[in-house]
Amino acid sequence: MSEQKQEIENENAQNSENLQDDLQDNEKNETNELQKELEELKDKYMRANAEFENIKKRMEKEKLSAMAYANESFAKDLLDVLDALEAAVNVECQDEISLKIKEGVQNTLDLFLKKLEKHGVALIKDEKEFDPNLHEAMFHVDSENHQSGEVVQVLQKGYKIADRVIRPTKVSVAK
């Protein structure tokens, strides 16, 4: 019986060793799987965080843009008033009363221009060369003093808010 007992103990020891090896292999596999899952979750987190930051930046940019151009329609409507004030200032005056009225209109025009400028409305600077982004060609004329494509005459001033044109400068262009 002692041999049988010895054999059983050896078998039990072998089984115990095999079981420990299997447990260690299982632990390694589980550890590897968990490590892999952790890496995947880290990657997902980083991507989600980057996407969130991009959305946040885009929303901020859209907010700033909306604020910058919120008054665009209103400012565009006021340009007709500006044109009328400029026309009134350009009228020839003969008598003292007309000169005083013209002076008052000029003061009003100056104040009006300052308020428009304060809110980002700016006159489009006169350019010699026709630029379709800033100008609207009303007609083409023959001109000995201008090269083809040059602005000959400004018919109506143009304005912009920041980098957006709210009314192009209306011009005649040399052929």
Curated annotation (Swiss-Prot):
Alphabetized NCBIfam families for the sequence: PRK14140.1, PRK14159.1
GO biological process: protein folding
Domain of life: Bacteria
Principal cellular location given in the protein's record: cytoplasm
Name this polypeptide is given: Protein GrpE
Compartment(s) of residence: Cytoplasm
Role, per record: Participates actively in the response to hyperosmotic and heat shock by preventing the aggregation of stress-denatured proteins, in association with DnaK and GrpE. It is the nucleotide exchange factor for DnaK and may function as a thermosensor. Unfolded proteins bind initially to DnaJ; upon interaction with the DnaJ-bound protein, DnaK hydrolyzes its bound ATP, resulting in the formation of a stable complex. GrpE releases ADP from DnaK; ATP binding to DnaK triggers the release of the substrate protein, thus completing the reaction cycle.
HAMAP family: GrpE
Subunit text: Homodimer.
Keyword entries, A-Z: Chaperone, Cytoplasm, Stress response
PROSITE patterns: GRPE (PS01071)
Gene3D superfamilies in UniProt: 3.90.20.20, Head domain of nucleotide exchange factor GrpE
Pfam families, per database record: GrpE
Gene: grpE
Protein species of origin: Campylobacter jejuni (strain RM1221)
SUPFAM superfamilies listed in its UniProt record: Coiled-coil domain of nucleotide exchange factor GrpE, Head domain of nucleotide exchange factor GrpE
GO-annotated cellular components: cytosol
Span list, region Disordered: 1-35
Biased composition (Basic and acidic residues): 25-35
Keyword tRNA-binding: no
